[in-house]
Amino acid sequence: MKMDTGTKVRTILFLIAWVNQLLSFDNLEPIPVDETTAQQVYDAVSVLFTIVVTVWTSFKNNYLTLKGRKQREALKKNGLTK
């Protein structure tokens, strides 16, 4: 399956965000933090990052399906996209 660079970047960030979130739920942070305040900040930033990346990937046309790839080709054919 051929994907454009933007789709690849968004998909990778999406996966990183969700893996990080799942690890955070199980208290398996890559960098152990002992201070309570630092942990709360980390959790808040982690949730915010996950929400932002999820919204970004949801609303951006990623052309992942066959229909989406056909739409991208039609847009390119008619000069309506980069």
From Swiss-Prot:
Protein's UniProt keywords contain Metal-binding: no
Periplasmic compartment residues: 26-40
Xref: InterPro entries: Holin
BP GO terms, sorted: killing of cells of another organism
Localization in the cell: Host cell inner membrane
UniProt topology in membrane: Multi-pass membrane protein
Stored Pfam families: Holin_SPP1 (PF04688)
Keyword field: Cytolysis, Host cell inner membrane, Host cell lysis by virus, Host cell membrane, Host membrane, Membrane, Transmembrane, Transmembrane helix, Viral release from host cell
Record carries keyword Transmembrane: yes
Membrane-spanning intervals of the chain: 9-25, 41-57
UniProt topological domain (Cytoplasmic) ranges: 1-8, 58-82
Chief localization: host cell
Highest taxon in the source lineage: Viruses
Gene Ontology CC terms, in alphabetical order: host cell plasma membrane; membrane
Protein name: Putative antiholin
Species: Bacillus phage SPP1
